[in-house]
Amino acid sequence: MTDFTNSEKATNYQAVGEFNRTFGHPANTVFQHKIFDENPQTVKLRLDLIKEEVGELVDAVNENNLKEILDACGDILYVVYGMGQVFGINLDHKGPLESIEKPGYPKFSRNYSVNKNVFTESYQDVKKLVDKISDTYNCLDLSVAEKNIGDVSYHLYTILTFVYELSDLVGFDLDEVFDRVHRSNMSKLCLNEQEAVETIEHYKTLPGFESVIVKYRLAVDNKRYVIYNAESGKILKSKYFKLPNFSDLLE
């Protein structure tokens, strides 16, 4: 597994590659042209993850909830980069919209200050960008149905671009948000088998999980443990999962 030092910081895309490898998900380096036919369950999972997070963003905007907007934007980046890793689409490469600085690397260099009046001053602009993100997801869904990996690549990058534009409009450092989401996502791991067993028992008590088969397996480091939905393959959180904290970014 690649170990990035402080002097060689991973890009956002590379960080998600670290997550995928640690949790036993693919981190491919070449286009997976046959993935639509050979692994449709994985394709569906990746689409569903993006759809879920885009829906969270729509809800956050409708509720004028800045904290949830930050959270949703960070999560959208994560699942879009995740789909890129699985499909072998290097989202560190320059995307289709050349006028926009490359998402995730290098970082934007500006002083950020969240505009707490954005819903009164720029609501229509925010809404337009969120609509663009939703529309692009629909285009992505269609491209997957058509098994067109070139268009899938285009739409993934376009979603990233619009999310970065939204973060710029609202006034927050999306790369910092992403870093916090990444640290939080890595805390989904159980540190030992005892934590994994406790987490399995914990899910048995949660509403909505009555018919869900939750299992655990060793992570690739052969030390920590991954909790997952046995039917869908979706990664689930450790009982000791730590939510990302954005409170200081909203001050």
Curated annotation (Swiss-Prot):
Entry-linked Pfam families: PRA-PH
InterPro entries linked: NTP-PPase_DR2231-like, NTP_PyroPHydrolase-like_dom_sf, PRib-ATP_PPHydrolase-like
SUPFAM superfamilies: all-alpha NTP pyrophosphatases
Name of the molecule in the record: Uncharacterized protein L479
Species assigned in the record: Acanthamoeba polyphaga mimivirus (APMV)
